Amino acid sequence: MAEYDLTTKIAHFLDRHLVFPLLEFLSVKEIYNEKELLQGKLDLLSDTNMVDFAMDVYKNLYSDEIPHALREKRTTVVAQLKQLQAETEPIVKMFEDPETTRQMQSTRDGRMLFDYLAEKHGFRQEYLDTLYRYAKFQYECGNYSGAAEYLYFFRVLVPATDRNALSSLWGKLASEVLMQNWDAAMEDLTRLKETIDNNSVSSPLQSLQQRTWLIHWSLFVFFNHPKGRDNIIDLFLYQPQYLNAIQTMCPHILRYLTTAVITNKDVRKRRQVLKDLVKVIQQESYTYRDPITEFVECLYVNFDFDGAQKKLRECETVLVNDFFLVACLEDFIENARLFIFETFCRIHQCISIGMLADKLNMTPEEAERWIVNLIRNARLDAKLDSELGHVVMGNNAVSPYQQVIEKTKSLSFRSQMLAMNIEKKLNQSGRSEAPNWATQDSGFY
């Protein structure tokens, strides 16, 4: 369903290598014409050194012989790779030394490690540039494991002020994502975020751009790492600089934040967060909306249960065709039904099972079994009267203390949103090309 596909918007903020998995996914889903997707892959590959991959794509796209320019490029890439391997081999051998490995694991100070290598192995400053160039070349060739290894060596040796320090962090994160090493990718994501947040050299606009890129790159990690759906809420909703970036540069990210909230396994946290999420969705509804955000609006703003049920059916189509969200489908539908049920029950103290079945798009028998399971698993304070076919809700009285906490949180959040809106109006809105790590000489500027 191309209408709700965000691939083009998201790709604008990604390194070209990170776009390939998205195109492969679209190819399987058959949302777009296959030849258009192949041409898109070929265009992306033109600025990489993955020549063999480009040749395979060209063969699938065209029946004629592979262009001479591609064959020449392959010869050039192989020659460059051999030259860089020869230059880097002595450096790599230093890191293979067991004592060097021990020093790297025990020493947190890059300067001390550099001095140790200089004293024991004759390591020189220019070796860092050689190591960085080789790591980047490996990445351009699609050897992400090699790139990650050499970028790790580079990172532990260079100071934060090095001209390639920030660029190497982007490269390391991309490499781990493309190898699907989610624990390592989460560590790299955290390290990169800290670097961006503590960077006093970048202008406010540059920091905004960096955070926007980080938001998009983080989707790979957050929707694959076990703790991802908690972390995405904390980062996107409760860290003002990142919520501001979403509202200013990429409101389409609300789809992913909303899905993370709805599918979060912590029931208590999910209910608390929903109130804050609804406010953001309402505020940004004029800039972005899709069935997922509209489902929340229907249910929690308009209390339109028929509309919510209709949007839930549309959500299934959106989730199935979204690269990042396809694995969330089952959790989303289950929790969305629970939300409809809970909201409906807050309005009606006693509800017939038949009416509930209609609202949840189930048969009465399915609805009864579903409610029994909710009560059994302590997710619902209610009693079921099977003879009358009624569900009677329990009385969940909220203490005055809890009411004060909720009102204080609400005021704090509203103040935060007001401050962000003022900042948004004052800031000059600007967009930039995504950080294409593999094709930059140094950094992204």
UniProtKB/Swiss-Prot annotation:
It holds the Pfam family EIF3E_C. Coiled coil: none annotated. One of its GO terms (biological process) is translational initiation. One of its GO terms (cellular component) is eukaryotic translation initiation factor 3 complex, eIF3e. It is found in: Cytoplasm; Nucleus. GO terms for molecular function: translation initiation factor activity. Disulfide bonds: none annotated. Its main location: cytoplasm. Keywords: Cytoplasm, Initiation factor, Nucleus, Protein biosynthesis. Residues 221-398 form the PCI domain. CDD domains: eIF3E. Belongs to the eIF-3 subunit E family. Component of the eukaryotic translation initiation factor 3 (eIF-3) complex, which is composed of 13 subunits: EIF3A, EIF3B, EIF3C, EIF3D, EIF3E, EIF3F, EIF3G, EIF3H, EIF3I, EIF3J, EIF3K, EIF3L and EIF3M. Component of the eukaryotic translation initiation factor 3 (eIF-3) complex, which is involved in protein synthesis of a specialized repertoire of mRNAs and, together with other initiation factors, stimulates binding of mRNA and methionyl-tRNAi to the 40S ribosome. The eIF-3 complex specifically targets and initiates translation of a subset of mRNAs involved in cell proliferation. This is Eukaryotic translation initiation factor 3 subunit E. It comes from Gallus gallus (Chicken).
